[in-house]
Amino acid sequence: MIQISDLLLIANVSPEVAGSSGFNMIASFFAAALLIVIPAATFLIFVSQNDSLDRTSATRRR
């Protein structure tokens, strides 16, 4: 079985570049979570809670 380090040497990629690339990929995942996923989830939870309250109060009025 070929080791990852052998693949990096065959591809002529230095370990520093590979490490930097991996770090930047993980950092971009965290940035996406902070900028997109967390605000979207917060908004959806807020809207669903308000909709639930509106439906509950509308049912009581009938």
From Swiss-Prot:
Compartment annotation: Cellular thylakoid membrane
GO CC term (a single one): photosystem II
Annotated keywords: Membrane, Photosynthesis, Photosystem II, Thylakoid, Transmembrane, Transmembrane helix
Subunit-structure text: PSII consists of a core antenna complex that captures photons, and an electron transfer chain that converts photonic excitation into a charge separation. PSII forms dimeric complexes.
Gene Ontology terms describing biological process: photosynthesis
Record's keyword annotation contains Transmembrane: yes
UniProt xrefs under Pfam families: PsbX
Main subcellular location of this protein, as a coarse class: membrane
Topology in the lipid bilayer: Single-pass membrane protein
Keyword Transmembrane helix annotated: yes
Transmembrane segments: 26-46
Role summary: Involved in the binding and/or turnover of quinones at the Q(B) site of Photosystem II.
Protein name (database record): Photosystem II reaction center X protein
Originating species: Prochlorococcus marinus (strain MIT 9515)
InterPro entries from the UniProt entry: PSII_PsbX, PSII_PsbX_type_2_subfam
Assigned protein family: Belongs to the PsbX family. Type 2 subfamily.
Top-rank taxon, per record: Bacteria
